[in-house]
Amino acid sequence: MDRAKPFVWRLVAASVCLLTFCHLARADSLEEQRNRYAQIKQAWDNRQMDVVEQMMPGLKDYPLYPYLEYRKITDDLMNQPAIAVTQFVRANPTLPPARTLQSRFVNELARREDWRGLLAFSPEKPGTTEAQCNYYYAKWSTGQTEAAWQGAKDLWLTGKSQPNACDKLFSVWRASGKQDPLAYLERIRLAMKAGNTGLVTVLAGQMPAEYQTIASAIITLANDPNNVLIFARTTGATDFTRQMAEVAFASVARQDAENARLMIPSLVQAQKLNEEQTQALRDIVAWRLMGNDVTDAQAKWRDDAIMRSQSTSLIERRVRMALGMGDRRGLNTWLARLPMEAKEKDEWRYWQADLLLERGRDAEAKEILHALMQKRGFYPMVAAQRLGEEYTLKIDKAPANVNSALTQGPEMARVRELMYWNLDNTARSEWANLVKSRSKSEQAQLARYAFNQHWWDLSVQATIAGKLWDHLEERFPLAYNDLFTRYTRGKDISQSYAMAIARQESAWNPKVKSPVGASGLMQIMPGTATHTVKMFSIPDYRGPGQLLEPETNINIGTSYLQYVYQQFGNNRIFASAAYNAGPGRVRTWLGNSAGRIDAVAFVESIPFSETRGYVKNVLAYDAYYRHFMGQKEALMSDSEWQRRY
């Protein structure tokens, strides 16, 4: 009986293999393919590679099969032959990881020191900086020196520290005697401007022995920009030393604008600055003298400097300062200083009309406001509200029937499956490739297709890629409508306002993370989430990972928005600014304006360009969402419009 057991087990194993083979042969349905895909991934994660090898061949028709191939290749990239990687890249030209793989394998071939093989694999410049450095080193290694030196120069001219792979390229370039001394100095300047003190020190330390005096001066300046006057007086006046002095001077001005202001004549004399270079220093200081704490002498000096400036952005900042102070005379003066091109911006056309109305020139003012109303966005809606007229949204309609050719093909099939598996960010990469390769009319159809599939973020992404600004339905889908209905019920904030905030924050990508750690649809910081959960007794919150779940994010996000909305008297202008820049800053801005200005002036005078644009967008987006909900779509409520700020 015991002797029969091995035979029995061999028979069972053969039967299992036969059943598996039969299953492989007939695994045609999408549901079966998805199940097998999940099984393969699970086996892979458990390092059951025999199971992976057995099951993969039966999944070649599944749209995400190339991702399995990619994993197989990259798991053992050090031992992959170039032909295998080349075949994969060529077979999947639109697959996002294939482009990543190309750069990775260039670096692998560099590790092998297979320079000819590297150039055969990648005849064109690869995508990443590290791979490019290896590519141009391969050019040098194979005798293509001119191309190598040009590539080295292009990679050299940055204030960032480059990958270690670039060191050997830069070393052979320097040793060849072909490195341009001006390029060397330019990188020091760029590093200084980027605040990369470590790189400045390294580069200065590598300068030839005969340049040790200037090298020492550069290092001293990088370590303490307050030495700028000593630097200016002890180094010869050259374009390089003037540029270095200007960068250091900007750092001084950030710390002590008055000290910088008084320093200008000495710098001008020491470095023999011309009027244009001198004005650049004045502009730097003028930017720092826009607060409420400047003296009368500083204010006069600032305005004299701006009056001579050619910087449009600086003059615009001065216009906004006049708006925030309720200084009508200053508003007129500084608007007049703007160049003609800048005066055509929506905001400055509106304020020109505002001044005309004040002078009784109603016909001219109304002509400007009516012209603005033909456009889209914040100021066109403001113009309508100022005139007491209804604003008409222009909405372009995408074709109801999407061309079937656009919805077929491997890219769209992969997008569908990635969205099924909730791999939103990978799907976005695939979608971006697909949309980018299409005509504008096809992009509109793709936006509509995504809209119909409830791929809200992909719908928005297609309208952005195609600049389909009047396709408002696809740009502003009623995403997660049920969740927003539920979590705004019983709150003072409207559903449309909460959705406008979410649309501005994430463009409806539920998996997006900001560089500073904000997560999900309403871009919530972990600390804010913890505080809000406690304040509102929100149950079942376990940690920041849940912020990528739409329901959790909307629950916490709408609660926090309700909190700031109530803090600021149910005013969306203040609440939106606070959501973006923090409640403390909004209180400071309110204290500065001191009830002297109207709502539009307050928005335009917000000193942070990001927050200013944020508030304008949210108010406009709220109006769009109210339109799609069949509600009144005036930009501001009566209380927001009529109060003083």
From Swiss-Prot:
Compartments (UniProt record): Periplasm
Record EC number: 4.2.2.n1
Keyword Lyase belongs to the record: yes
Active-site residues annotated for this sequence: 505
GO cellular component, one term: membrane
UniProt keywords, alphabetically: Cell wall biogenesis/degradation, Disulfide bond, Lyase, Periplasm, Signal
InterPro entries: Lysozyme-like_dom_sf, Lytic_TGlycoase_superhlx_L_sf, Lytic_TGlycosylase_superhlx_L, Lytic_TGlycosylase_superhlx_U, Transglyc_AS, Transglycosylase_SLT_dom_1
Pfam families the record matches: SLT (PF01464), SLT_L (PF14718)
Annotated GO biological process: cell wall organization; peptidoglycan metabolic process
Catalyses which reaction(s): Exolytic cleavage of the (1->4)-beta-glycosidic linkage between N-acetylmuramic acid (MurNAc) and N-acetylglucosamine (GlcNAc) residues in peptidoglycan, from either the reducing or the non-reducing ends of the peptidoglycan chains, with concomitant formation of a 1,6-anhydrobond in the MurNAc residue
Molecular function via GO: hydrolase activity, hydrolyzing O-glycosyl compounds; peptidoglycan lytic transglycosylase activity
UniProt region (Slt-type domain), positions on chain: 492-582
Top EC class, one word: lyase
Disulfide bonds: 133-166
Signal peptide segment: 1-27
Family to which this protein belongs: Belongs to the transglycosylase Slt family.
NCBIfam families (alphabetical): PRK11619.1
Function: Murein-degrading enzyme. Catalyzes the cleavage of the glycosidic bonds between N-acetylmuramic acid and N-acetylglucosamine residues in peptidoglycan. May play a role in recycling of muropeptides during cell elongation and/or cell division.
UniProt protein name: Soluble lytic murein transglycosylase
Organism: Salmonella typhimurium (strain LT2 / SGSC1412 / ATCC 700720)
